[in-house]
Every structure is written in structure tokens, then in C-alpha cells.
Swiss-Prot record:
Zn(2+) binds at C271, C276, H278, C284. Belongs to the TRAFAC class YlqF/YawG GTPase family. RsgA subfamily. Monomer. Associates with 30S ribosomal subunit, binds 16S rRNA. GO terms for biological process: ribosomal small subunit biogenesis. One of several proteins that assist in the late maturation steps of the functional core of the 30S ribosomal subunit. Helps release RbfA from mature subunits. May play a role in the assembly of ribosomal proteins into the subunit. Circularly permuted GTPase that catalyzes slow GTP hydrolysis, GTPase activity is stimulated by the 30S ribosomal subunit. It comes from Listeria monocytogenes serovar 1/2a (strain ATCC BAA-679 / EGD-e). It holds the Pfam family RsgA_GTPase. This is Small ribosomal subunit biogenesis GTPase RsgA 1. It is an enzyme of class 3 (hydrolase). The lineage of its organism: Bacteria, Bacillati, Bacillota, Bacilli, Bacillales.
Length: 346
């Protein structure tokens, strides 16, 4: 069955649709149309007028969604999602990127793109999506000593598998492919030019995606993916490619943040006060870890930054939280200024 190759499972087939309708999966999103594949054909579909009028933008179809298709090839409804990846735009509105993927592959290159702060941000949204995160480090052939990067990953990516790959020699792909479940859906996340298109070609074993070279002046790749699209590989995996995202806003669900920064969250449980701001309160376990070097300042400050960003989006979407959050962060900021002024220099 075609849809089984495209990842449909009993979770979706058990969701009831009309007898005259059929199941489909969205393989690409364009401005006014969606490319959908069913058991019989692949086509461009539009939304059924009126069915989505009063729904929020997050209820609209996105790449990876399983949908109900009418006899005249219109999308009637979106089936319940298992996983979903979204980001917050500049207006604090949630923007859907993709849905129903099993693995979130965070692709970074071992050149100027390698950035732990960005990695922590990607890990936060990956955990929050409900999928299993995997770190892919491309251009491993350019690095003589990988231990430097391995040590940095250990500091922020707790228990997340990392694979060092070379798209030219195919080094590292055998280990990755043996760990991926067959017929699973993968989403690729990463900045422009990190080698996502080349990675897909290596995974597919053919030149499926257009690629571009690296600019010699800054080691940055050229952007090649312009829209979200799904690809069925001959080896059975389904890959969702996304345009490069160097910066994006995280939402206001704490689950992903708590998993990414599980070490800080565990430390916070040892604080004397349950409402500790982790800046200068007595018997603060987080500050104690900073003092003895157990917790790095970079990791701690990134945690605070993402906490504040989530609080910002939360109060933008829930005005009742605005005053409470402003008052809370005024106290935190004042405490931080006092703490860092009085903290002895090492």
C-alpha cells in the first residue's frame, strides 16, 4: 500500500473519516495549495471552503499531516497528530513547520556553524515536538580531532546520540542507518548551508536534492531548500526537509526546555526555596554548581535566556500573565545585577 510506505499506521487509520472520503498525506506546502498523496494518486489539493474558516492557523495542514480527502480532491480535515514542530514568529504567533515525524535530525556542520547555544535551542524544540532528537554533524572530513566537539556535546546534549558524517565518503552513515527504524519519518532541522541537501542525497544513495557549494570567505553554505517538502527514499525512510533556520523563537511549552536542561532542572530541585530565581538566594543549588564549576556559565545563561523567551511568548498569548511575569523578571534582573557585582572574580 502506498500510504503504508508513506508512514500511515493504525494510529491514523483508526481515526474515523466519512465513507466517501479517503486518507492522504501532505507531502509539500505551497502558498495556496497542498501536495497530497493517497493510495491512488498524488495531486495538488485545496482546503474545503468553510471547514477551516474559524480554526486557528495551527489547525491548518502542514507537511507530514495525514488528512481526510473528499471525492473531488479537497482537504476536509486534519487527523490528530502524533508529533509536531512549530516555531514562534516575531508576533509571538505559532507557525507550523511539520508534523508526524519519528526523529528530529539536528544538522550542524563542523565549521563556523557549530554553535552550542543554537544546538540547545534546537534540542528544546525537538524534545517539545514529541520526536526523538538525533544530532548530525556534517563535514567531519574537515576535522582532524573530533574529541573537541565530542566534549562540548557531552556538556549540553544529555543522552542524545550524535553521528559524525562525511557526505562525500559516506563515512558515519552506516552507524546512523542501523539505528533508524525502518519506514520512519525524519525531519531535518538546521541552518542554511550545513549540508542538509547533501545529507539527504547520501542517505538516499542518489542525487535527490539540488546542492550548493561553500563560500570560501566565511565557510557558509549557500541556501538551496526554499520550501518544506517530503521525500520517500528508496530504502524506505521518509525525509522532511525544511528551509534553513538560523534563528527561531521557541514556544511556551516547558517540557522541551526541562528535558534539554535536565541538569539545571535537577539542580534546582535542591534549592532551599521552591520559588528560587537561581541568582542570589541563600542555599541555591544552581549557584553552588556555578561556583564549583559543575555548571558552566554559558549553559546557565542560555537556560535563563530561553526561560525568559518562553515567558515572553506566554504573556503575549495570555495577557493575564503579563503583570505577573513582569514583576517576577524585575526581581530576577535586580538579583542578577546585585549578584554579579558582588561575586568575587576568579
Amino acid at each position: 500500500m502506498i500510504l503504508e510506505q508513506y508512514g500511515i499506521t493504525s494510529f491514523f487509520k483508526e481515526q474515523k473519516i466519512a465513507a466517501t472520503s479517503s486518507y492522504g498525506r501532505v507531502t509539500a506546502v505551497f502558498r495556496d495549495y497542498y501536495r497530497v498523496i493517497t493510495e491512488n494518486e498524488e495531486f495538488l489539493a485545496s482546503l474545503k471552503r468553510g471547514n477551516f474558516y474559524e480554526l486557528s492557523s495551527t489547525s491548518l495542514p502542514t507537511v507530514g499531516d495525514f488528512v481526510e480527502i473528499s471525492g473531488d480532491l479537497q482537504i476536509l480535515s486534519v487527523l490528530e497528530r502524533k508529533t509536531v514542530f512549530s516555531r514562534m514568529n516575531k508576533d509571538s504567533a505559532e507557525q507550523l513547520i511539520a508534523a508526524n515525524f519519528d526523529y528530529a535530525l539536528i544538522v550542524m556542520s563542523l565549521n563556523h556553524d557549530f554553535n552550542l547555544n543554537r544546538l540547545e535551542r534546537y534540542l528544546t524544540v525537538a524534545w517539545d515536538s514529541g520526536a526523538t532528537p538525533i544530532i548530525i554533524l556534517t563535514k567531519a572530513d574537515l576535522v582532524e580531532d573530533l574529541s573537541f566537539y565530542a566534549q562540548q556535546l557531552e556538556a549540553v546534549a544529555y543522552g542524545v546520540p550524535a553521528y559524525y558524517v562525511d557526505n562525500l565518503s559516506h563515512h558515519g552513515f552506516e552507524a546512523l542507518e542501523s539505528d533508524l527504524k525502518p519506514n520512519s519519518t525524519l525531519i531535518l532541522l538546521g541552518s542554511s548551508g550545513v549540508g542538509k541537501s547533501s545529507f539527504i542525497n547520501s542517505l538516499a544513495g542518489t542525487d535527490l536534492m539540488k546542492t550548493a557549494g561553500i563560500r570560501e570567505d566565511d565557510s557558509k553554505g549557500k541556501h538551496t531548500t526554499t520550501h518544506r517538502e517530503m521525500h520517500l527514499l528508496s530504502n524506505g525512510w521518509i525525509v522532511i526537509d525544511t528551509p534553513g533556520m538560523r534563528e527561531f523563537g521557541v514556544g511556551f511549552n516547558q517540557a522541551g526546555l526541562e528535558t534539554t536542561f535536565s541538569d539545571v532542572e535537577e539542580l534546582a530541585e535542591g534549592c532551599r526555596f521552591h520559588d528560587c530565581s537561581h541568582t542570589q538566594e541563600p542555599n541555591c543549588a544552581v549557584q553552588a554548581a556555578l561556583e564549583d564549576g559543575t555548571l558552566t556559565m554559558q549553559h546557565y545563561e542560555n537556560w535563563l535566556k530561553l526561560q525568559r523567551e518562553m515567558a515572553y511568548h506566554a504573556r503575549k498569548n495570555s495577557p493575564a500573565l503579563a503583570r505577573q511575569e513582569r514583576d517576577r523578571w524585575k526581581v530576577i534582573q535586580k538579583s542578577m545585577r546585585t549578584h554579579f557585582k558582588t561575586r568575587p572574580k576568579k
